Amino acid sequence: MKGYSEDLYILAFDHRGTITKGLLGVEGREPTQDEANKVSELKQIIFDGFLKANESGITGGDPAILVDETFGLEVQQKAKELNIKFAAPVEKSGQKVFDFEYGDQFREKINEIGADFVKILVRWNPDDEEEIRETQGNRIKELSDWLSENDKKFLLEFLVPATEEQLA
């Protein structure tokens, strides 16, 4: 059976640009090592909370986390050690048009990370320019085909930002 047949409860903390900009005021540059360490510490605190909740018992489905490699590599590694299901994002953070975080090396990176699920976030509006829809559609298909060929699970998160005309 393709897909995942169980209920899955995912604690998502794969935020990158949102955290660095919103909490640390980092904009238009990469975070410093100290800033990156602060974000990694925050992700560890979130993971510790997940572990505490998991120890208390979660019924009705499989608990999992969604965490990025950029600031959450140690969390990903610990999740693997503890046999906790995890998803990893492979999209570039904060992009209006979906692109791969690691460019053409996304396949190698997915294999290296070893996540149970691969996730992308795509901003998509049916009224987007045809070229944007085609570019994103081709990239989604490329990833989907490769994941299917390599027996990997896929999570697709769509955001549908409204245009000014749609809001009027």
What does each model-identified segment do?
Residues 124-128, 136-168:
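Conserved anion-binding
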Residues 1-132:
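Alpha/beta catalytic barrel-like cores
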